[in-house]
A protein has these predicted regions:
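DNA major-groove recognition helix of helix-turn-helix/homeodomain DNA-binding modules
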Residues: 45-61
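Short amphipathic recognition helices of helix-turn-helix/homeodomain-type DNA-binding modules
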Residues: 61-70
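A short, Lys/Arg-rich alpha-helix, primarily the initiator
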Residues: 1-21
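Residue-level detection of the helix-turn-helix DNA-binding "recognition helix"
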Residues: 13, 38-39, 52
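Recognition helix of helix-turn-helix/homeodomain-like DNA-binding domains
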Residues: 27-42
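DNA-binding alpha-helical recognition surfaces that contact promoter or target DNA
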Residues: 10, 24, 35
Length: 70
């Protein structure tokens, strides 16, 4: 299972964006963004917002990680 918080942090870094930038976009504090980075799971509404501001489909990343045994 992927660590969604780490994936969000990696994408933010890849885009050369700052934590302050993300906090402004999410209308939250920098501390809240750092807490997001530490999460293994995340609220879907928050993930949708993050996906939109980073132009990255984190839902697809999660879906790609699912293995279904037949």
């Amino acid at each position: 299972m992927i660590n969604i918080g780490q994936d969000i942090k990696n994408e933010l870094t890849r885009q050369e964006r700052t934590v302050s930038w993300m906090a402004r976009k999410l209308n939250c504090t920098r501390a809240a963004v750092y807490r997001i980075f530490g999460k293994n799971s995340i609220d879907t509404a928050l993930l949708a917002s993050i996906s939109k501001i980073l132009h990255h489909n984190f839902f697809q990343d999660l879906s790609d990680d699912i293995v279904i045994d037949e």
